[in-house]
């Protein structure tokens, strides 16, 4: 979803006292005791999970401690990692040096890096980074496309509280949906729905607001009201109010939601004028454009002729999947994924790049990466060296045990091949131009295998047998499935 939004939870970080100055030196003994207490707490919790509540005894802890201290490497690692960010300490210099921004295949036209800032709009930024390329090519202008318009309409349309009023409020489904009744995350098929229903506009006629770039507080307000409204509707249903009464109440509730969003983002234009000079100095002017006209006539990108392919090794390949209750527009196309092997996904991506087309994709961006360096590489952080451990789960197992899921959307714009095999990939991110190479990242091919889950292709660029899978009746994954996480 974005640079500031994590979708997996872990142990909360504990901020401990430090020896930053002489005044605090006498607290060092307390610090050691605190750390020892935390260590025992972690181990005891872990043992409780594995052994059904049996606590570790002092003899076992002493045995672990003796073995730990008998290895000089452990003491060296402790001294280094305790005092700095472990990812900095364990950074694999050789891997970082080899992850260079040189690619044998690269699309001819690239835009400047965009910045989603403190929001979860990566899916929209990645989409408009794809959409702007036809505008740059055909009109010789680097005008950005507005995301706030799509952001507002996405927030408005991902709300339906009446359909599930009879579901038990404590059911897993309701608790999951109440966990994030609305957000600024999304999926590619949601992009198609927004473009087809509302169109898109140049950024100059509908610029960013503070709240589109910093969406946390707006999301909180809307989420709070939606939970409140859900409660009210369920109470009305329990008191046997008619469906007409519920719908009338919902219409009034949605007016309130619209007001909150309009105040925070501004209303998107219904009609606008667009004037600019191209790179050759030629002047253009367009008057009375609607967002849908701009999308159809100026952008001229056929989003409806694209589709999503995923690599989900938990399920059989060459089948169609969807996620229950995942969508944004009533009557729009549902979320659909064609499941394919990872090697097929890579070959299709290479073919698209060779034909000069960027490729929108979804991945688990927080794994084995350094955002300041702009590197995505399984070898980059050497946890094995620092902790003498190995991570042994397969991609399917990580999905099954909540260790991985799609968290971010970006765009492939290049690949480096050796003997026709991919070595590294060029990635257009939306975290500003100060990371990586002016906002572009490099991805090692092994990282693609483990952490890339989805790509989007034009149907004409995919084998017909994959396009034909879209005619299948989709198998429905539950609402909380990790294949829907990018929209949460």
What are these regions (language model features)?
Residues 96-360, 425, 435-438, 445, ...:
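Active-site nucleophile-adjacent alpha helix/oxyanion-hole segment immediately C-terminal to the catalytic cysteine
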Residues 57, 85-86, 145, 290, ...:
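Helix N-terminus capping/helix-initiation residues
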Residues 7-29, 33-36, 40:
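Intrinsic-disorder signal
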Residues 332-407:
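Long, positively charged binding patches that form subdomain-scale interaction surfaces
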Residues 28-111:
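N-terminal regions that are enriched for targeting/export leaders
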Residues 413, 418, 423-488:
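Conserved catalytic-core surface of thiol
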